[in-house]
Amino acid sequence: MNVGVAHSEVNPNTRVMNSRGIWLAYIILVGLLHMVLLSIPFFSIPVVWTLTNVIHNLATYVFLHTVKGTPFETPDQGKARLLTHWEQMDYGLQFTSSRKFLSISPIVLYLLASFYTKYDAAHFLINTASLLSVLLPKLPQFHGVRVFGINKY
């Protein structure tokens, strides 16, 4: 028995998406967002699906691909301060179950939004642009890459 030895991760960002119940909470939050948008009376169903998709993808982009460092003061802050949350996740390993889940969820939401908007051209373009903006940074080829120097520091 190790008395007085901490058993937590050095950087909690690396394992947060592997926590128990986090995927279910993620799905419930997206469902709640959709229900809140459906409760607004002057939004049509296609607009609600497009808004759900765009808000989800915008939030995912901000929290996973623009915010850098850790929200905690950790011993590895020197290394993690230049990495986004996506780059820190699962210690930088590609194709883990958490990364697959976070890559598939925008695609499923995109397919649902496309179906319920009946592939209307305007909604389709907005949903496709939103999907590409959140899916491209997740590719392994973009790990650590800062396009046009955006978010370099």
Swiss-Prot record:
Residue stretches spanning the membrane: 22-42, 43-63, 106-126
Taxon lineage: Eukaryota, Metazoa, Chordata, Craniata, Vertebrata
Domain of life: Eukaryota
UniProt tissue specificity: Widely expressed. Expressed in adult and fetal heart, brain, lung, liver, skeletal muscle and kidney. Expressed in adult pancreas and placenta and in fetal spleen abd thymus.
Family recorded in the similarity comment: Belongs to the ORM family.
InterPro entries per UniProt: ORMDL (IPR007203)
Name of protein: ORM1-like protein 2
Subunit structure: Ceramide-sensitive subunit of the serine palmitoyltransferase (SPT) complex, which is also composed of SPTLC1, SPTLC2/3 and SPTSSA/B.
